């Protein structure tokens, strides 16, 4: 279902501040620190400034922390915004990455597969050129249930924005003409055929607002950021690639995602952009009204 439908007609270790020429090996530098990451209790963490960058793996209010510490470590990276992407990911690349998801990784075993995943490019900076299908403020959709990567904080400024990036120009045109309500509990084509990109609360530009993002729905975009496998979602309930049902409750086309987003660009009006388009054909989200 996934392969046929999403094609369409067509003290945090700041690894991210490496110079562009060195970032290709960023993946293995991150992986070399996987075994030293631990899940911890939040203690007196009360605000986003207490969480990032002081808690590199986030934390939990549980007295017995069991979350995937290396996964959170990756989520909480702060890559420099000017890092040059090492490649562009399209449909074929995401299908290939799905095929490489290690058996047995489960929800909490990212560390065991860190080197293998780094070999697939996890941790390197990549670009995705597609269309913005949906925007989700997880503060609202989670009913302010905080994630461990953000120290289980429940404040409005402590939640990620989820973006659905798809590849079907016809569906994108429909969304642009008549943007449907995004309902993660009732996923449709826009959710099931898109890859997820996440803007994290401590790395996103102040002008990357939900309102400004929603004005770009259906438009051609280029998203730049860290490639990461969110192994929590590598299952039949979440990842449509794991499901054989033509229609089901799965809500994403891949467990691989861009997280965090470092750049978000929109194709200029009157242009038809591609991965080879010059910078002059794109405009940064923060420069748009």
Model-derived segments and spans:
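Sec/Tat signal peptide C-region and signal peptidase I cleavage site
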Residues: 18-22
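Bacterial N-terminal signal peptides that target proteins for export
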Residues: 1-8
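Bacterial N-terminal signal peptides
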Residues: 8-17
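OB-fold and OB-like single-stranded nucleic-acid-recognition modules
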Residues: 23-289
